[in-house]
A protein has these predicted regions:
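Interaction interfaces in information-processing and related assembly proteins
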Residues: 2-97
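Cys/His-clustered metal-coordination modules, chiefly Zn-binding fingers
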Residues: 91-157
């Protein structure tokens, strides 16, 4: 079998998670959500602006020995609603699913209204409700009713 010289192969991971179909350019934000930093001790592979039939261009993050929590999935969904998760075990995909935008977000997004009670020293957690999903997902603050685009919102990490 002949391999296309322009194709780059990245080795498989034994156990972990592959986050695929990330909005192009958003891989660094996904890494922040997942707490991946320079001192991360497992294998982390990031591919950015990869050609995609589905999205035109996409980012991919492969993480060995990392399984995602529900909070992580919700945060990823807010910045990359078309992302897919592949759970890997013994080098095989054992589960594959798409993220979905949560109806309610608590303590995930920061309200852009600096006067909102969720930004005060009162210790009130942010609380947003999904307003609509197309063309861009937008969430409305429960307290001040500020509308925020999910892909431009500041995440609370």
């Amino acid at each position: 079998m002949e391999q296309d010289a322009s194709e780059l192969k990245v080795s498989k991971i034994r156990r972990g998670t592959v986050v695929d179909h990330i909005t192009a350019g958003m891989a660094p934000a996904v890494l922040r959500i997942l707490g991946i930093h320079a001192g991360f001790s497992s294998v982390a592979v990031v591919a950015m602006n990869v050609k995609s039939d589905k999205l035109g261009y996409k980012d991919i993050v492969k993480l060995e020995q990392v399984m995602l929590t529900e909070d992580m999935l919700q945060m990823i969904a807010t910045i990359a609603p078309q992302a897919t998760m592949n759970v890997i075990d013994d080098f095989q995909i054992v589960e594959k699913y798409e993220v979905s935008l949560p109806e309610v977000l608590r303590s995930i997004l920061k309200c852009p209204n600096r006067h909102c009670i969720s930004n005060s020293s009162e210790g009130v957690a942010s609380h947003f409700a999904l307003e609509h999903t197309a063309p861009i997902a937008e969430y409305r603050c429960h307290y001040c009713e500020e509308l925020v685009q999910a892909d431009r919102a500041e995440l609370i990490l």
